UniProtKB/Swiss-Prot annotation:
Residues 1-20 are annotated as: Disordered. The gene is ubiE. This is Ubiquinone/menaquinone biosynthesis C-methyltransferase UbiE. Keywords: Menaquinone biosynthesis, Methyltransferase, S-adenosyl-L-methionine, Transferase, Ubiquinone biosynthesis. Methyltransferase required for the conversion of demethylmenaquinol (DMKH2) to menaquinol (MKH2) and the conversion of 2-polyprenyl-6-methoxy-1,4-benzoquinol (DDMQH2) to 2-polyprenyl-3-methyl-6-methoxy-1,4-benzoquinol (DMQH2). It comes from Rhizobium etli (strain CIAT 652). One of its GO terms (biological process) is methylation. PANTHER family: 2-METHOXY-6-POLYPRENYL-1,4-BENZOQUINOL METHYLASE, MITOCHONDRIAL (PTHR43591:SF24), METHYLTRANSFERASE (PTHR43591). S-adenosyl-L-methionine binds at T81, D102, N130, A131. Pathway: Quinol/quinone metabolism; menaquinone biosynthesis; menaquinol from 1,4-dihydroxy-2-naphthoate: step 2/2; Cofactor biosynthesis; ubiquinone biosynthesis.
Length: 258
C-alpha cells in the first residue's frame, strides 16, 4: 500500500498536498518547502499543532524509554533540527548516540548549530541522505524514530522497508505523525484552523503562506491510523500499535523488528 499511483502515461504519480505530481518531482518540491522554513521550523510546528507538538514529542520519548547505557544507537529520520534527537540523548542520561538523518541540508545546519549550543555534539551525528536509501549497514540501530516527516517521503513503503532493514533484531520503530481526528466537533474546529488560520499565520511569520498550505494539505492526504498501521505491518514489523494524541490530531505508531 503506497501513496504512489500509475499515471495515464505509465509513469508513477504521487501526492504533493492536493496536487498529483510525477513521483520524481515530489522530493524537490518538499525540499523547497523546508529550505524556506528551516530557521522557523519549531515555530511552524507550534502553529500546525497549536503548541501541542512539544507534549506529543515528550510522550514519544517516554514511549521509547531510551536505555541509559553506552552503545544504545538511535536513527532519527527527517530530524534535521534535532528536536527529537536532543530529547533522546537527554532521556538516556547522555548515554545514547543519535544519528540525525535529513535530506535537507538547511534543516541539518540548524540542528548542528543547536547541538553545539546544547553541548550535545559528542552524542550526535548529522547525515544528509534520503529516507528511501539509508546509507547504513543492515541491523545498525536499536531504534528508528521519525516525527512529522514520513508524510513528506515520496515512497512511504520504501522508507518503512529501509527502517526495517537498518534496525537490529528486537529494535523498535516509532512514527509520530499528524493523523485523522476521531472526534467530529474537534475535526471541524481543526479543519477550520488548518485551512484558514495556519496559512495566514505562516505568511505572517515567514512572509510566505505556500509552505504552510502544502503542509496542511499533506496531512489530509496521509493514510489514517489503521491504513498506516497496515503499511507498517507490510514492511515486516510485528506488535504494531498506535496511540492517538489530542483526539487523533496526531498519532504515535509503534512496531518491532522481531
Amino acid at each position: 500500500m503506497s501513496e504512489s499511483r500509475t499515471s495515464a502515461d505509465g509513469g508513477m504519480e504521487t501526492s504533493y498536498g492536493f496536487r498529483e505530481v510525477p513521483g520524481g518531482e515530489k522530493q524537490g518540491l518538499v525540499n523547497q518547502v523546508f529550505h524556506k522554513v528551516a530557521k522557523r521550523y519549531d515555530i511552524m510546528n507550534d502553529v500546525m499543532s497549536m503548541g501541542m507538538h512539544r507534549v506529543w514529542k515528550d510522550a514519544m520519548i517516554a514511549a521509547l524509554n531510551p536505555r541509559k547505557e553506552p552503545g544504545y544507537k538511535v536513527l532519527d529520520v527527517a530530524g534535521g533540527t534535532g528536536d527529537i534527537a536532543f530529547r533522546i540523548v537527554e532521556a538516556s542520561g547522555r548515554q545514547a548516540h543519535a544519528t540525525v538523518l535529513d535530506i535537507n541540508g538547511s534543516m541539518l545546519g540548524v540542528g548542528a548549530e543547536r547541538a553545539e549550543k546544547k553541548k550535545l555534539s559528542a552524542n550526535l551525528t548529522f547525515v544528509e541522505a534520503n529516507a528511501e536509501e539509508l546509507p547504513f549497514e543492515a541491523a545498525s540501530f536499536d531504534a528508528y524514530t521519525i516525527a512529522f516527516g514520513i508524510r513528506n517521503v515520496p515512497r512511504i513503503d520504501v522508507a518503512l522497508a529501509e527502517a526495517y532493514r537498518v534496525l537490529k533484531r528486537g529494535g523498535r520503530l516509532l512514527v509520530l505523525e499528524f493523523s485523522e481526528v476521531d472526534m467530529p466537533l474537534l475535526d471541524k474546529i481543526y479543519d477550520a484552523w488548518s485551512f484558514n488560520a495556519i496559512p495566514q499565520f505562516g505568511k505572517a511569520i515567514t512572509g510566505d503562506a505556500e509552505p504552510y498550505q502544502y503542509l496542511v494539505e499533506s496531512i489530509r492526504k496521509f493514510p489514517n491510523q489503521e491504513n498506516f498501521a497496515a503499511m507498517i505491518r507490510q514492511a515486516g514489523f510485528s506488535r504494531v500499535s498506535h496511540t492517538n494524541y489530542t483526539g487523533g490530531i496526531a498519532a504515535l505508531h509503534s512496531g518491532w523488528k522481531l
